[in-house]
Amino acid sequence: MTDLNVSLLPWQQKVWNDPIRFQVIAAGRRTGKSRLAAWKLIIEGLGATKGSVFYVAPTQGQARDIMWDMLLELGNPVIASSHVNNLQIKLINGATIALKGADRPETMRGVSLKFLVMDEYADMKPEVWEQILRPALADQKGSAMFIGTPMGRNHFYD
């Protein structure tokens, strides 16, 4: 397989090496949360034998603005195709990385997920995780990364 030059900051490397199933990363703006998430999406996608990996932002527009170009840049050597209209990237192993908006939860029902990133989870309804995405991870015992900027006490804090 093509070599990817995964370059991480020391704090990102600690998170990367942590085997916990559900990671929560609360960090300030411009610290590298999204870049870490992009690398995780690519590597987890390459390791998926079935199912997909999702990146979920509060809206699909935010998902595109935050993650699309970064995934195309970092994953270029292992991307078989990309479709900006539906925000999906097909990797060379056949796995799909899909970018979704939590404001349209119906588009995320009925899938089997290997990995999931929820970005700015504090800006989403908790039901999106509890009723839709958590069950989508169950059959594969998939993992998830919650990232966001601290905003007081809410469901992301909990």
Predicted regions and their residues:
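Phosphate/NTP-binding elements of NTP-utilizing enzymes
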Residues: 1-158
